[in-house]
């Protein structure tokens, strides 16, 4: 059980490669205005690391809880920048959306959080589906079987919980409803690659999607807050475009009160796109915003 409000802190709002792109910065004749803008203070919201968020709330036992959604390649840098600013310290659980590098390749860096209390090492609960578990075990075998560790032997400790796509699960008193979505397809077979979003409290989180089945839309409908994928202006085989994200948000009945688009590549200027979506505000249109790293919202 929880008491008081729940906050969502965006630790990252970019795609897998992040923004800026280093080759854009080192180009002898640079032309990428978005990447170049990150070198100046006024372009700070164009710095976008792998999409990730922290669900922060006060438990009824009087201790704050932090549930991390995804832990990608840039998690360490996100934590270094945002943890102190938002008075975060521990990680009580990790929920993983899918088996791509930008969702779980930062897990090795969680060893430090397992050893915050050196007298009482902590095993972080991890919630993921079976396909993601299988891929993780191949990528990081020592995270699943500590006997496979090498070097000095300092490794993170995790306790794994397998999610079923059609069943709710509870993390630290918060009920999560899985939201299965298509995130591109397998190149070898053409079958859809599945990613999970999650509905909890009055928020639905869908960070990686190319299409959303009607059965999943039924679970999203009624959310007051929607976090939705939107890679760039043009269509893409594994992500919603910004226009598709807006269209999907407006297709919901009832519409969410607020929507935040995430997952941007380096062709998207935060300030330009945010001005565009703000211009859509009306009584019949949800407030859609371009999310940015470090942003904190109440849900």
Regions found by a protein language model. Give the residues of each.
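Binuclear metal-dependent hydrolase catalytic cores
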Residues: 1-206, 272-299
